[in-house]
Regions:
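Nucleotide-activated chemistry modules centered on ATP-dependent adenylation/adenylyltransferase
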Residues: 1-227
Length: 227
């Protein structure tokens, strides 16, 4: 059975990196270049991604002829209570996407503290919940395709083939035995690529620019190169 075949409502979660882009390519390949109507590709922008990441998402759409739904959070004060905040999901595009951290800044103002390894609310509020909001408009239940590789087993086993209460979670790259070496080999042979360093299939510059999950030395290196 092809692990990339889709026959039910599915959200292909595209983070903007090479691995999830490879997952998207394999899904397209499994359907002769045209995703079924049940599938939607989503990219949740936090405003803290590198400009190259946003360009890469658009390049994938253009080169592969696939529609990608760009989503962002809007967090604003709402109601009469002083500390009441409303969380909304809006569609944007490559042209209109936030590039100065606006969604992230709004979230921090609402929470009044920064995310950290013990409270990763940034991922939940800015990415996961935004995709769920969008999917709930069309479906009561769906499967979420997540780009976690076979060499990321500790991450994969926590969510692969598991439900979180509103969606089934599935990691096709993990199921297919794909490693970062496969991702590297794929991208060095394409006519376009993410314009960030390719360190054997991974990059220190991916996802949010100064994410706390990146080591201190990596964050300092990024700051030195782009003050």
């Amino acid at each position: 059975m092809n692990p990339y075949r889709i026959d039910e409502p599915t959200a292909i979660s595209f983070s903007g990196g090479r691995t999830s882009a490879f997952m998207l390519y394999k899904c397209l390949e499994a359907h002769d270049g045209q995703l079924p109507d049940e599938a939607v590709v989503t990219f949740a922008n936090t405003g803290k991604e590198m400009p190259e990441t946003l360009d890469f998402v658009q390049a994938c759409a253009d080169n592969w002829g696939v529609d990608i739904v760009w989503l962002e959070a809007r967090v604003r004060r709402g109601g009469e209570e002083e500390n009441k905040y409303v969380y909304e999901t809006v569609e944007v595009s490559h042209a209109t996407a936030s590039r100065k951290g606006e969604p992230f800044t709004q979230l921090i103002e609402a929470k009044v503290y920064a995310p950290n390894p013990l409270a990763r609310f940034c991922t939940k509020e800015l990415k996961v919940d935004r995709i769920k909001d969008y999917m709930r408009v069309y479906h009561d239940w769906w499967t979420s395709y997540i780009g976690i590789r076979a060499d990321e087993r500790r991450r994969a086993v926590k969510i692969h083939n598991k439900s979180d209460g509103s969606q089934d979670q599935y990691c096709p790259l993990y199921a297919d035995g794909v490693t970062k070496e496969h991702v590297y080999d794929f991208w060095i042979n394409q006519n376009f690529d993410l314009q960030l360093p390719n360190n054997n299939g991974t990059t220190d510059w991916g996802n949010c620019d100064l994410c706390f999950l990146k080591g201190k030395s990596k964050r300092l290196s990024i700051i030195r190169e782009r003050p």
